[in-house]
């Protein structure tokens, strides 16, 4: 079952260290990252771009902006380590870029948790992303 979940996360095309990001989102929100955020709003998941639909979607927009600021690592491929201590994400890298990558993922997971009350099922499977309005630059 766990292998199936990991494969599903990989197929969604979410950027970053997919396994770690997925775990963080699950730990912080209790929601399945693929089914809950894989195609949410204009910014969550694959092809994410556009003016955020709500605070949840804004978390994903800010996350993409965070990735754009990383210069010496590849958010789509590089892997990092973190731990879950006392219900808190602790990034554990000595490499500064991997630490920043982990912090980007940590921030989006916490943001999604803090905005669970704005989660709107009508944006859950938004496959009309090409019709999202252009967002302000990061």
Curated annotation (Swiss-Prot):
Keywords of the record: Disulfide bond, Myotoxin, Secreted, Signal, Toxin
Positions annotated to bind varespladib: 43, 63-64
One Gene Ontology term from the biological process aspect of the record: negative regulation of T cell proliferation
Annotated site, Membrane-docking site (MDoS), chain positions: 49, 64, 68, 76-77, 129, 134
Known regulation of activity: Myotoxin activity is inhibited by suramin and varespladib. Inhibition by suramin may be caused by (i) distortion of MDiS from both monomers impairing the membrane disruption mechanism by the toxin and (ii) surface electrostatic changes of the complex that interfere with the toxin membrane dockage process (putative-MDoS is partially hidden). Inhibition by varespladib is probably through varespladib binding to MDoS.
Places the protein is found: Secreted
Annotated residues for binding of suramin: 34, 45, 48, 85
GO cellular component terms, semicolon-separated: extracellular region
Signal peptide, first to last residue: 1-16
Tissue: Expressed by the venom gland.
InterPro entries for the chain: PLipase_A2, PLipase_A2_Asp_AS, PLipase_A2_dom, PLipase_A2_dom_sf, PLipase_A2_His_AS
CDD domains in alphabetical order: PLA2c (cd00125)
UniProt site positions, description: Membrane-disrupting site (MDiS): 128, 131
Disulfide bridge positions per record: 42-132, 44-60, 59-111, 65-138, 66-104, 73-97, 91-102
GO terms for MF: calcium ion binding; calcium-dependent phospholipase A2 activity; phospholipid binding; toxin activity
Pfam short name (any one): Phospholip_A2_1
Primary location: secreted
Family: Belongs to the phospholipase A2 family. Group II subfamily. K49 sub-subfamily.
SUBUNIT field: Monomer in solution. Homodimer; non-covalently linked (probable conventional/extended dimer conformation). Homotetramer (dimer of homodimer (probable conventional/extended dimer conformation)); non-covalently linked. Homooligomer.
Summary of the function given for this chain in its UniProt record: Snake venom phospholipase A2 homolog that lacks enzymatic activity. In vivo, it displays local myotoxin and edema-inducing activities and is lethal by intraperitoneal injection. The myotoxicity effect is weaker in comparison to other myotoxins, probably due to the formation of high molecular weight complexes and to the oligomeric conformation (conventional dimer). It shows specificity toward neurons and myotubes, but not on a variety of other cell types. This PLA2 excites a cohort of sensory neurons via ATP release and consequent activation of P2RX2 and/or P2RX3 purinergic receptors.
Name assigned to this protein: Basic phospholipase A2 homolog MjTX-I
